[in-house]
Swiss-Prot record:
Topological category with respect to the lipid bilayer: Single-pass membrane protein
Membrane-crossing segments per the record: 1-21
GO cellular component, one term: endoplasmic reticulum membrane
Naturally occurring in which organism (per UniProt): Saccharomyces cerevisiae (strain ATCC 204508 / S288c) (Baker's yeast)
Top-level taxon of the source organism: Eukaryota
Miscellaneous comment: Present with 2440 molecules/cell in log phase SD medium.
Main location: endoplasmic reticulum
Subcellular location per the Swiss-Prot or TrEMBL entry: Endoplasmic reticulum membrane
Upper taxonomic lineage: Eukaryota, Fungi, Dikarya, Ascomycota, Saccharomycotina
Protein's name in the database: Uncharacterized protein YER053C-A
Keyword Membrane annotated: yes
Keyword vocabulary terms for this entry: Endoplasmic reticulum, Membrane, Transmembrane, Transmembrane helix
Length: 37
């Protein structure tokens, strides 16, 4: 169970980091990313 908790925490951290970076890129370059609208 401890390994599962560590995996979930790492996955959540990566997901939040990717989501924040993706929103920043989308707000900065909306026309440069036509495949992720």
């Amino acid at each position: 169970m401890q390994d599962l908790e560590i995996f979930l925490s790492i996955f959540a951290f990566i997901f939040v980091f990717y989501f924040g970076a993706h929103r920043t890129v989308m707000n900065r370059n909306k026309s440069d990313v036509p495949y992720l609208q």
